[in-house]
Structure formats: C-alpha cells, structure tokens
Amino acid sequence: ESIDLVGKVKKEDLFTFHKEQYGLGSIKIAAAGDVSPADFNSQIFEAIGDWSIKEVEIPKLTEKAREPKEGSEIIKVQDKTSSDLYIGQPIGIDREHEDYYALMLGIYILGGNFSARLMQTVRDKQGLTYGIGSSISGVSFGADGYWNIWGTFSPDILKKGIEATKEQVDLWFNKGITEDELSAKKTTISGSYKVSMDSTAGLAAKILSNAEHGRELSYLDEYPKIIESISLSEVNSAIKKYVNPNKLYMVAAGTL
C-alpha cells in the first residue's frame, strides 16, 4: 500500500506541498557554538526573510491505540539466511504521560542495550540470536505508542528463539527489575544523553528537538534529573500496568 501511494506522487504534488507548508511562522532553527545571536538572526532572515508567513496547523491525533491482542504472522521470504522477529503491543500512552519514563526504563532494562537482559541471556548465554532488543516507539506529538522486541535468528532455531524470548518477558513481568539494574541503566541513559550533546551539532539537535516538542530550554538539564527520580516501584508498577505477556502480537519474516 505504501509503495502504491509513493508511486502516485507527482512533481506538482511536491510543489503544492512546499507552497502550502513551508514558510515563516512555524519554522524553528537552532544553533550552538561561537555564534552571535544578532549575527545569526541577521543571516537567517537574509536567507529566508522573503518567505511568506504561514502558521501550519498540525492536526491533533485523536485515534487511540487498539486493545492488545494475541496473534502471529509468518511472512515467507525466499533465500534468506536469517529470519527477523518482531513482538509487541500498544501501550496507550504518549511521551508526555506521567508513566512514560518509568515504563521506558523498564523496557530499556529488558532490551535497551548490549548489557540488557535479552542480549545477556538469549544472545550471550544461549547463543540463539545475532542481536535482540526492545524499545518504545511512536510516542511523539500526542500519539499513543507501542513497545516491541526485535530479534534476528537463524530460521532453524527461530522457534527456540521465540521461546527463550518469551521466557525472559515472563520473568521480567512477573518478578520485575532489581534496584541494581535500575541504578545501572539510569547511569547509562543519563550518560548517553550528556555525551550526545558533547558537540555543537549534538547540542543544536537537542535544542531543536525540544523546541519542536514544545519543551523549554531548561529540559536539557531536567531530563537526567527526571530519569534519576524514577523509583523501583514506579518502574515495576508501569510494567504491570502497560504490558500483557498473554496478548503479544508476533511477526516473523524469512525463509521459514
């Protein structure tokens, strides 16, 4: 369907979109470094000052996430040496929800990096996957998001990989995370966040992202404090509230 829609786009459609959507009024520009605000503004308006002033109305998302349901799909792709697996479900909240950070931390502990549970067990201990992880997606600009697990497996051990992955999800859901895990991942997330701003490009990108999401400049300093403030009970409660291991949807693709 997406391929068909892209194929129908004409050159005139692009010109029309640019004319209707591009202009001053809604544009946001960020810069970081040895920059004079006065000189910067002067150069910007010299470059695009003749653009018309347009306030682009971004439609509010009103459609809510569907209720989670158990299901599976197999997509057969010939001559593939590996198979890809996605498991997930909607969470029904966006990034501004009060439970977002707690749930994000819980899912990061499950599969957010190389030292997370899924990589340590399904990959390193059991040797069943080339790579596996979990994350929250689709939560920006008021959208109800979802959480998912992804993994890459040899087709002949995909079934074992699925079983091992679900075993870790059940353990994570039923037993929760530990204080040591939470402390370690808080350090990782806050550290990565700070490192991402160690260049002028990274700092400008963060400032622009915050502006696009309607956040104040102070959020640059607030984010690590928010992460640090999340308690163990908040994370484990969020996992119980927004995850249902009995209603996961699974899609696998490959030579199966």
Q: Predicted regions: what is each one?
A:
Residues 41-48, 162-168:
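Short amphipathic alpha-helices in soluble, non-transmembrane regions
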Residues 33-38, 154-158, 255-256:
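Helix N-cap motif at beta-to-alpha junctions
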Residues 19, 32, 107-111, 170, ...:
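Amphipathic alpha-helical interaction elements
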Residues 36, 55-69, 123, 139-140, ...:
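Acidic/histidine-enriched alpha-helical segments
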Residues 1-25, 50-97, 108-159, 181, ...:
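Non-catalytic beta-strand/loop surface segments
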Residues 28-33, 98, 180-256:
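C-terminal regions of mature proteins
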Residues 36-38, 47-54:
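Bacterial peptidoglycan biogenesis and beta-lactam-recognition machinery
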